[in-house]
Every structure is written in C-alpha cells, then in structure tokens.
Amino acid sequence: QDIKRKTINICIMNLLDFYRQYPDEASCEEALRRFREHHGLFCSQCGGLRLSWNPSHKSWTCMDCKHEMQLRSGTVMQGSHLPVRDWFAAMFLLTATKRAISTKEIQRQIGRKRYQPVWEMVHKLRDVMGKRDGGYPLHGDMEVDEGFFSTETPEEQKDCPLKRGRGSQRKTSVLVMAESSLPKTPPAKKYSTPKSVGHIKMQVIDDFKASTITSKIKQGTDGNADVTTDGFSSYVSLEKNGVASSHHTVVTDDKRSVGKVLPWVHIVISNAKRSILDTYHDIK
C-alpha cells in the first residue's frame, strides 16, 4: 500500500541541540520508549494493546499473554549490541547535512574501534530510509533517464572481455526519475533551470529491457504521470502499458537541447557522482 504524503513540521537540530537533548544513554532509551508508545504499541505475540513498562528489564509485559517485549524489539536496532545513543548519533550524522558521510567517518565520530558493527548499523539505517522513501509514488510531470556510475568490475566478470557503452562491467546502471514541472513564475536568473523539481527516485537496474524499465517506473509512480524521456527504445511502450498517462519523447543529438528538456535527471546524476567521489575512494 502506497504511503500518502503528509506535510509535517520538522525541527532542525544542530550538533549542540543533539547533545543537549540526548546527553546520555538513559535519555536516548527514554526518548525511544516515549516515541514507540506515542505511535502505537502492541504485543508482538498476541497483538494485545495492554502493555506495562518494566524499567528494570527495559521491556514491556503484555497484560494478556504475559509476553515480554524488549525496548528495541521490532525496530531497526533489534539484535544490535551498540548503544541506543550510537544509533541516534548515526541518524543525526546521516541526516544533518546536505553532503554524504562515510561509515568510516561515522565510526570515528562515535568513537567505536570495530568497523563491522558500525557498517551494519549504517547499512540498516540506509536500507530503512530507502524503503520509507520508496513508499511515496512520484506523480505529475516527470523526467526519466539512465545514469551510469563507475564501479569495480564484479569478480565473476573480471576475466570476461570488457563491453562498451550500455552493459559495461565497469558501469552500474541507474534509472533516474524526477518530478519536474514549469514554475508559475519564470526563474529570475538568466541561466537558471527552466523547470522546478519535486521528489526524485534512483534505482539500480540489471539490464535495459523494456520490461525491466517499465516495471521500475510502475513501482515508483502513481500510474498517472506525464513522462518525458529520450528516444531510447525501451521507453516506447510506457503509455501503452498503462505506466504513464502520457509519454513525450525527445530525440536530439544536441546535448544542450536535452539539458533544457530533461534538466533535472542530468543534474541529479551529476550531483550523485560528485557526492560519491567526495565521500568514497571507490565503490562496488
């Protein structure tokens, strides 16, 4: 079921605010308990709603079946031995700035000696963040194109002859979708992008078959989008297959023209590549 978009008030927190609000492990555990109880808590065993908090065990006890449910049960933190405060700090570091941050830097910031548990924590957080964003379908006017990111050649393909262009072993293919519409008032700056951007989705694809691309677009949109693409053959049947309410194709060899008609997908691809190069030495 698709998650409906909601307008929420976000409290911007800086580093000093974070340490003031969460000075120790006890404050983080209390915040997690209040959050879970506020957003609805039920017994994982019988579904009962009558739960009693046991501070000495840091768990709830179901009044109906007597099942004991730990503070982290059913959350992304379940099974982790890292303190709740480390999880809160990682969430803050991942979302507090526009620039990406590496797991190695998060490890340094929270003062952990071992890399593996920090990597697992960050991987879980990024996974659930992606799933949450994946629940919001794109709609309205939309641009679609593919991006190619330089990555290491997979081990099983290192002895194979290198391909060129689409399908190269040294490139990972990503389908980029961006809500893009003409603003009510024209941009003030002469060289500003002529369209305004909304939400964006990027998904790794294994091949460029029409069925693969159609499936990814169908998963990421509400089915009523007005899609604009280049002349790649895999996009031809989008409207016919009910993936888009209308489909506009731009066929041109002039890169400047494509940049004007499909500006935001190219900006997104460029920014993503720059972010990866600024944050990581290499990616697989």
Q: Where on the chain are the PLM-derived regions?
A:
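Residue-level recognition of single "structural anchor" positions
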Residues: D2-K284
